Amino acid sequence: MKVRTDFLCELNQKKIWLRREDLIKEKVTGNKFRKLKYNLIEAKKMNSKAILTFGGAFSNHLYATALLGYINGIKTYGIVRGNEWKEKLKENPTLINCVNNGMTLIFVSRDIYKKKNNCAFWRIIKLNPSKFYIIPEGGTNELAVKGCSEMLDKNDNIYDVLCCPVGTGGTISGLIKSSTINQKIIGFSVLNYNNLKSDIDKHTNKKKWELNN
């Protein structure tokens, strides 16, 4: 399918349009595909045997990683926040779809999950991180931003303001990087995360953007 932009309405003499990123690829929609696109290319380039990533029990990122890993013949591992879901797997369609697409799920408590950026985390779960191509929670890294920057092309220069929800900051960072000097980017944060603005600043030096909680 092809991404399209649909007219929604006119408000205060301003026309509002909706970018249909959900049409980009069957089953893996919008920014998830774009975030993983270049990470998968890099994993293959590095001859990685497996991808490991992180997410909550209803994480679209985990599902997208599992499906694209399956399609590309790369084994996937998902660290799931909340070890109670190990006993409730059948109640969770997201995790069931992950398993059905070949992902090995590793359930950890919320306290342990908070340590995922520390060396001690890997000792606790008894895995060697050097054995995996690791993608952070939510999928945001430089390669994800590169993929998300492809949302815009010269045909989008007609828009004055671009808005999007913001989780880990990858999508808005891509939009900021590929926006023109005359465009403003507005993000609406969906998470309670104090360092989000500084994380976005790491990916771009442009200043014509704002983040609303």
Please describe what each predicted stretch is.
Residues M1-N213:
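PLP-dependent amino-acid enzyme catalytic core
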